[in-house]
Swiss-Prot record:
Pfam families: IL1 (PF00340), IL1_propep (PF02394). Monomer. In its precursor form, weakly interacts with full-length MEFV; the mature cytokine does not interact at all. Interacts with integrins ITGAV:ITGBV and ITGA5:ITGB1; integrin-binding is required for IL1B signaling. Interacts with cargo receptor TMED10; the interaction is direct and is required for the secretion of IL1B mature form. Interacts with HSP90AB1; the interaction facilitates cargo translocation into the ERGIC. Interacts with HSP90B1; the interaction facilitates cargo translocation into the ERGIC. IL1B production occurs in 2 steps, each being controlled by different stimuli. First, inflammatory signals, such as LPS, stimulate the synthesis and promote the accumulation of cytosolic stores of pro-IL1B (priming). Then additional signals are required for inflammasome assembly, leading to CASP1 activation, pro-IL1B processing and eventually secretion of the active cytokine. IL1B processing and secretion are temporarily associated. PROSITE patterns: INTERLEUKIN_1. Belongs to the IL-1 family. This is Interleukin-1 beta. Keywords: Cytokine, Cytoplasm, Inflammatory response, Lysosome, Mitogen, Pyrogen, Secreted. It comes from Macaca nemestrina (Pig-tailed macaque). The lineage of its organism: Eukaryota, Metazoa, Chordata, Craniata, Vertebrata. Its main location: cytoplasm. GO terms for biological process: cellular response to lipopolysaccharide; cytokine-mediated signaling pathway; fever generation; immune response; positive regulation of cell division; positive regulation of immature T cell proliferation in thymus; positive regulation of T-helper 1 cell cytokine production; positive regulation of type II interferon production. The gene is IL1B. GO terms for molecular function: cytokine activity; integrin binding; interleukin-1 receptor binding. It is found in: Cytoplasm, Cytosol; Secreted; Lysosome; Secreted, Extracellular exosome. Potent pro-inflammatory cytokine. Initially discovered as the major endogenous pyrogen, induces prostaglandin synthesis, neutrophil influx and activation, T-cell activation and cytokine production, B-cell activation and antibody production, and fibroblast proliferation and collagen production. Promotes Th17 differentiation of T-cells. Synergizes with IL12/interleukin-12 to induce IFNG synthesis from T-helper 1 (Th1) cells. Plays a role in angiogenesis by inducing VEGF production synergistically with TNF and IL6.
């Protein structure tokens, strides 16, 4: 807190001589009333603040006004501001305050974002082109056989999830889990041959948007029939045999003796 020692000669030119007429606004002097009211004043440099004295005694100007000011700014003079600072003036200052830098997005390690994405899914059953249903045979094997009547309750209900993969107009990547079981169909290499298996998973982590490639199948629709191509082994498909009660397997031929065409029936969850 410092007091103005004396009025500068430039300031005296605006002084009315009547002490009761001289008031300053807080954080000013942005505008001085009475003899100063027509002048829009501001500091040449920031940092000067004025405090109002609300008591008008017969005291000199020196005792009526106190100035809050940084010591290094005491020598600064008050000059008329050319115009009021507008919001749009900020646009001219921003390039001097901020330095523009390019931002590079590393897409190699975005698994966390993908895992947090919601997974769209549905429940369904599958039958091959001969209307054979898929049922469990042992803890980790599926077989295809004809079912009728109440036996249809034995067929497996799949939990089909739409996952990340190489999607195109005719291929939709999906994962096939078994409802109410922690099992997913997966494709692995056994004895140098692509093989279909049921793999146990942790239900806390599955299903997820970005499934490991061995779990992903490209769902292909042709003439109202569906094919399921392994994403891990292209041109290998979920297949059934012409014979009854044979295991479901991964086959490398289409349109041959092995059946690769299926129909899907939706099941309420």
């Amino acid at each position: 807190m410092a007091e103005v020692p004396e009025l500068a000669s430039e300031m005296m030119a605006y002084y009315s001589g009547n002490e009761d007429d001289l008031f300053f606004e807080v954080d000013g002097p942005k505008q001085m009333k009475c003899s100063f009211q027509d002048l829009d004043l501001c500091p040449l440099d920031g940092g000067i603040q004025l405090q109002i004295s609300h008591e008008h005694y017969n005291k000199g100007f020196r005792q009526a006004v106190s100035v809050v000011v940084a010591m290094e700014k005491l020598r600064k003079m008050l000059v008329p501001c050319p115009q009021i600072f507008q919001d749009n003036d900020l646009s001219t200052l921003i390039p001097f305050i901020f330095e523009e830098e390019p931002v590079f997005l590393d897409t190699r390690n975005n698994d966390a974002c993908v895992h947090d994405a919601p997974v769209r899914s549905l429940h369904c059953t599958l039958r091959d082109a001969q209307l054979k249903s898929l049922v469990m045979s042992g803890p980790y094997e599926l077989k295809a056989l004809h079912l009728q009547g109440q036996d249809l309750e034995q067929q497996v209900v799949f939990f089909m999830s739409f996952v990340q993969g190489e999607e195109s107009n005719d291929k939709i990547p999906v994962a096939l889990g078994l409802k109410a079981k922690n099992l997913y169909l997966s494709c692995v290499l056994k004895d140098d041959k692509p093989t279909l298996q049921l793999e146990s998973v942790d239900p806390k982590n599955y299903p997820k948007k970005k499934m490991e490639k061995r779990f992903v199948f490209n769902k292909i629709e042709i003439n109202n029939k569906l094919e399921f191509e392994s994403a891990q082994f292209p041109n290998w498909y979920i297949s059934t045999s012409q014979a009854e009660n044979m295991p479901v397997f991964l086959g490398g031929t289409r349109g041959g003796q092995d059946i690769t065409d299926f129909t899907m029936q939706f099941v309420s969850s």
